[in-house]
Amino acid sequence: DEAETRTSCLVPANDADRKALDRRKPAEVICPRPGLYARRAKWELLKRHPDIRALMVVRGLATQHPDWVFAHVSAALAHGLQVSGRSLGKIHLATNQTAHTESSGQIVRHCVPDEELAECVRVGGVRVTSLLWTAFDCMRSLPADEALVVADSLLRKTGRTAWWLVRTIKDAYCGWRGIGRALAVARFADGRSENGGESMTRAAIIRQGLEVPVL
């Protein structure tokens, strides 16, 4: 119940707890990832909310691995940004520029500059890259429609404007790979978009060269 209240998967405190949970599988309990548990009834209720499921996994992993710093869409979820369901299949972690650990399986590692790693924050018990870096990292690498979902939700969360986002990205990340893509998304960002579906529809309209609707 405590884990569910925190929107997290449960991490057993000891081997005895783990064995007790395993005995309740699969009727009552499921394992979204090794070592992480959730009540089947709760998990099934969230079938149409993959973002909440993904956030539960991220928070569970943060309990398992308190030294991990989450990045990209995993960090976006922790920050409360909206993310397209198409982006939620993997776990994204930050690594420094000298580390030689590679992505593998369901883990994607993102090289993050040391100055940004120094700015990592803890949100809801999860260590994550900063809000601005997280949004920029998503905007420069995701498909344009999914990137706009993140950009719109950032402006919705902060109450800022597209002009502010363009100016801030130029000032903070000039010269960074992918800045052109991020700026192209930022110019069309609008915090008045109510949800990800609306953002993706607007992205399709922009891509077709049609007049962008006034929100």
Where are these regions (language model features)?
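Short gly/ser-rich loop at a beta-strand->alpha-helix junction or flexible surface loop bordering the NTP-binding
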Residues: 1-178, 214
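A short, highly charged nucleic-acid-interacting micro-segment common to nuclease
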Residues: 62-65, 185-200
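Residue-level signal for short amphipathic helical patches enriched in basic/charged
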Residues: 142, 192, 208
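Hydrophobic alpha-helical segments and helix-packing faces
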Residues: 158, 175-178, 193-199, 206
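Helix-loop-beta segment of a Rossmann-like dinucleotide-binding subdomain
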Residues: 178-185
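A short acidic/basic microdomain associated with nuclease active sites
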Residues: 203, 209-215
